[in-house]
Amino acid sequence: MFAVIKTGGKQYRVAANDLIKVEKVAGEAGDIVEFAEVLMVGSTIGAPTVAGSLVTAEVVEQGRGRKVIAFKKRRRQNSKRTRGHRQELTTIRISEILTDGAKPSKKAAEKKAPKADAAEGEAAKPKKAAPKKAATKAESAE
């Protein structure tokens, strides 16, 4: 079964275990993301979205696309400008396509839970203050 999802202003046709690059999605490698804006599932077309459907995916990596060069030149003015741009991209692996309000499988939920516990543990630890510097000879002579 396939679905059409909308993310980052673009539409993607996805199926289970597909590996796709989309516009930047918040999350680190291994995090589970959910796409609720499902435009089509199999032969069911949404108006504008299919109610109760959900696509879950795992973030594989965060990266950047290839460089796009923007070159501007004004003729006969001895004026030109070159500028490069690299778009932030996220590679995701589609885990499952859910319909009729079904919940994500336990595997997806288990991967999500440990990340939340680790984040709370790190936030609880206070940072240590930097050690004070010893007085130099010039300062102690004064």
Curated annotation (Swiss-Prot):
Presence of keyword Ribonucleoprotein: yes
Gene Ontology biological process: translation
Protein name per Swiss-Prot or TrEMBL: Large ribosomal subunit protein bL21
Region (Disordered): 74-142
GO CC annotation, single: ribosome
Keywords tagged on the record: Ribonucleoprotein, Ribosomal protein, RNA-binding, rRNA-binding
Similarity section: Belongs to the bacterial ribosomal protein bL21 family.
Role description: This protein binds to 23S rRNA in the presence of protein L20.
HAMAP family for the chain: Ribosomal_bL21
Lineage: superkingdom: Bacteria
Record bears the keyword Ligase: no
GO molecular function: rRNA binding; structural constituent of ribosome
InterPro entries (UniProt xref): bL21-like, bL21-like_sf, Ribosomal_bL21
Basic and acidic residues compositional bias, start-end: 107-125
Start-end of Basic residues biased regions: 74-84, 126-135
Lineage of producing organism: Bacteria, Pseudomonadati, Pseudomonadota, Alphaproteobacteria, Hyphomicrobiales
Quaternary assembly: Part of the 50S ribosomal subunit. Contacts protein L20.
